[in-house]
Amino acid sequence: LTSIGPLLPTLRQATGLSFGGAALLTALPVLMMGLMALAGGAINRLFSERSAVALSLLAIGLGALWRELAPGSVQLLMSAVLGGLGIGVIQAVMPGIIKHHFLNSMALVAGLWSAALMGGGGLGAAITPWLMSIGHDWHSALAWWALPALVALLAWWPVSRGLSRLSAVGENRGPSLLRNRRAWLLGAYFGLINGGYTTK
């Protein structure tokens, strides 16, 4: 997600991407993340924890790899949709995984997860220009980010055997989040954070 920003001038020059297209390139992943957050309940019912994380990592990896083969702006935009879909799914299911498997250390693990998200975003913005500076073209500099996603997928699949369905955790759903004041406050808080983060 953050690897695109530093290369936008190069991308626009190489692909003829308009200013509107450049805005879409950064907005589409965020839109997909929001849609997947709304679909979190359905995702949790349809997929096991193991499958949901694996599919999300696969989508992120393929989205990044697609950029190696993207000759123009349309394919670049589609890769952004696929990557955003993967990020959105993993962000929708990870809180349930943390709650289910790390109940006694939930705050620590959730903090580590949040730090990893922010740190990974910073690395994407910092390392991608460096990859271009050592001789890679923009295609390759962006496609390199398929590697950590696919490594994570290969690591996740064997260690996650036996994980149960997320829906088993959430059978007692309690009151609707739409009537929960704290849920609205948290939504506004994280929305403002992500809004500021993605408009820099």
Predicted regions and their residues:
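Juxtamembrane intracellular "pre-TM" segments in multi-pass secondary transporters
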Residues: 161-186
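Residue-level signature of mid-helix packing/kink "hotspots" within the transmembrane helices
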Residues: 2, 30-38, 121-122
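Conserved MFS/SLC helix-loop-helix module at the cytosolic interface between two early adjacent transmembrane helices
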Residues: 35-74
